[in-house]
Each structure stands twice: as C-alpha cells, then as structure tokens.
Regions:
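Pre-Walker A (Motif I) flank of P-loop NTPase domains
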Residues: 1-2
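Hydrophobic anchor at the beta1->P-loop junction of P-loop NTPases
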Residues: 5
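The conserved Walker
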Residues: 9
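Conserved lysine of the Walker
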Residues: 13
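Conserved substrate/cofactor phosphate-moiety recognition/catalytic segment
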Residues: 18-62
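Glycine-rich phosphate-binding loop used to anchor ATP phosphates in small-molecule kinases
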Residues: 51-105, 114
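A glycine- and Lys/Arg-enriched "phosphate-lid" helix/loop adjacent to the NTP-binding pocket
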Residues: 87-161
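C-terminal accessory "lid"/substrate-recognition subdomains
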Residues: 148-156, 168-178
C-alpha cells in the first residue's frame, strides 16, 4: 500500500513513518521533500518563504508519481498547499487540479496528524508556532474540503489520539481497506 502522512511541523510525522515501516513488512519510507532538497544543496530561508514551499510541493508531486509500491511518504502535496495557504496564497493558483489529482490518486491512504492538546503536551515545542498553527488549520480545511476535487475517493485517517499507538491505528485502518 501507498500511504501519505501529512501534518504541520512538530506533530510526529517522521516518527510515525518510521514506526509504520517497522510494523509493515516490505514498506519503505520516502523522506520529506525538505530533506531531499537539502541534500541537493537547496538553501531554505529562515523563516521559510512561499518559494521554499513551492519547491517542496514540486518534489512532493514528483515523488507521488513514482511507481514504487509499499511506501510511506513523509508529507504529501497537501502539506505544502496548506503552508502556501498560510502564507496567503490560493491553492488554485499553486497547482493544476489534474496534476494534484494524478499525484494524490496514487495513494491508498492519507493519514493526517492535526495539532491536539495531547500532542502539544507530549511532543517537544516546535519552531515558528504561528506558522505551525496557521498551517494546521489550513491543512484540515484543504484535506476535508478537497477544493480542487483531487482526492474524492481517497480514504483519510485523522489521528487525534496520543502519539503512542498511532502506527497500530493506521495498520488497523489499512487492514480494513484491503
């Protein structure tokens, strides 16, 4: 199965991706676009700019179009659309609906990690709290609203519980999809 994990920074996405790959035989992790771009020498601004998020969006779209099976993606295009929306950009101006649909339709499950009081207590404080909160709100609006009609049939699992045990919840959800 192809699983995408989305959420604002500091919500435990990478940890969940690693746990899922340990739990699911044959699944491989795909690093988030930020790390891949850094490895290629991209220099990000501090704080990040819209162009930084556009670069990550392009990489994320490309990664999802790869034919690999049994992968867990650390971030999806919706993450970067949410960051761009938090920067005041309209998602319709950032990506063509058919390009987004092509990428998102390659997923079997989208897992979303929203900010919750519990994760705020249990996880370390993240940088740029204002951007983090703004992105979280935009992400949930985009995921549930699907304004470009790009993932009408994609199952979405929103994990609002504690970080411990998230991978098992995802595995149970996957079993129900097979």
């Amino acid at each position: 199965m192809r699983i995408g994990v989305s959420g604002t920074h500091g919500t435990g996405k990478t940890t969940l991706v690693e746990e899922l790959c340990s739990l699911l035989p044959g699944h491989a992790a795909v690093d988030e676009p930020y790390l891949l771009l850094e490895d290629e020498g991209h220099e990000f601004h501090q704080p990040p700019t819209s162009e930084d998020f556009r670069a990550q969006l392009r990489v994320s779209l490309r990664l999802l179009r790869s034919p690999a099976a049994d992968v867990v993606f650390d971030r999806t295009p919706v993450d970067f659309l949410a960051y761009l929306a938090a920067h005041g950009r309209t998602i319709e101006a950032e990506v063509a609906p058919e390009v987004l649909e092509s990428a998102m339709s390659s997923l079997d499950l989208l897992v979303v990690l929203p900010l919750t009081a519990e994760t705020e207590r249990q996880l370390p404080a993240a940088e740029l709290p204002g951007l983090r909160t703004a992105m979280d709100g935009r992400l949930l609006d985009i995921v549930h609203g699907d304004p470009l009609d790009a993932w009408p049939d994609l199952p979405v699992l929103e994990l609002t519980g504690p970080p411990d045990g998230r991978a098992a919840v995802v595995a149970r959800a996957m079993a129900g999809l097979r």
